Amino acid sequence: MNTVGTPLLWGGFAVVVAIMLAIDLLLQGRRGAHAMTMKQAAAWSLVWVTLSLLFNAAFWWYLVQTEGRAVADPQALAFLTGYLIEKSLAVDNVFVWLMLFSYFSVPAALQRRVLVYGVLGAIVLRTIMIFTGSWLISQFDWILYIFGAFLLFTGVKMALAHEDESGIGDKPLVRWLRGHLRMTDTIDNEHFFVRKNGLLYATPLMLVLILVELSDVIFAVDSIPAIFAVTTDPFIVLTSNLFAILGLRAMYFLLAGVAERFSMLKYGLAVILVFIGIKMLIVDFYHIPIAVSLGVVFGILVMTFIINAWVNYRHDKQRG
């Protein structure tokens, strides 16, 4: 697997992530089971975005010093594009979490605890998926065509899909988990497991955590191939992906109260997936530069938010 990642870059990335996670977990322990306020969510979102951009700047500077601008510029652009793709696709993941918490009636104060472990699990699972994907691409480059076709299909499916939280309990996976886990009927404070009559029982909070992890894996199947369309370098794919999901918990609490105001977002994300799928399928005929890909993704997001604002304005005017 060809990569610009040196031991210094890998080590620096690991240290930054470890320190930030330690700070986040320490603050979580001090606050206990309290919901993150909108102000705190906005502050943490800004911290994670700023940290990601600073890392990319340091990454670019390091490559300028060691490889030159000809290498540094496209690699830094690849990181930024991958980060933007993952960050935008992660919003749909957040909306699924909202449906899960709503369906299982998880109090806001306990949602934070679930998401702490959910994000930690996502880091481990995505790291495994990215290195596996990088190895497969290095051995079988035709897999990129499969990724492209899959993203094209997923984009169309996303645009046509109708999300309904009322059927979550009837999903085969949920029924299977409930049938195979010894589980209580009610949430017991912040506990994932409780003891009754000497036996260990999972609580519904544990079921929600499992579903949060599985939903992230499902979304990673979309987002990780999307970043491979930009670069196959495992260092850039992993760092851009993990920096994007590290801010997911803060993003969740930032968007939780206004999710219904983003009705058009899934269509914008669907267009992004279709564009990336086409980019992967035509790579042998025409190579779309990274800067163009970044511009297209950013442009689609801007247009989506403009259309969304217009739709919200029309709805508010009709209600008003």
UniProtKB/Swiss-Prot annotation:
It is found in: Cell inner membrane. Residues 1-6, 65-89, 135, 220-225, 283-286 are periplasmic. InterPro entries: Integral_membrane_TerC, Integral_membrane_TerC_rswitch. The gene is alx. One of its GO terms (cellular component) is plasma membrane. Has been proposed to be a redox modulator. Keywords: Cell inner membrane, Cell membrane, Membrane, Transmembrane, Transmembrane helix. The keyword Cell inner membrane applies. This is Putative membrane-bound redox modulator Alx. Residues 28-43, 111-113, 157-198, 247-261, 308-320 are cytoplasmic. The chain crosses the membrane at residues 7-27, 44-64, 90-110, 114-134, 136-156, 199-219, 226-246, 262-282, 287-307. The keyword Cell inner membrane applies. It is a multi-pass membrane protein. Belongs to the TerC family. It comes from Shigella flexneri. It comes from the Bacteria.
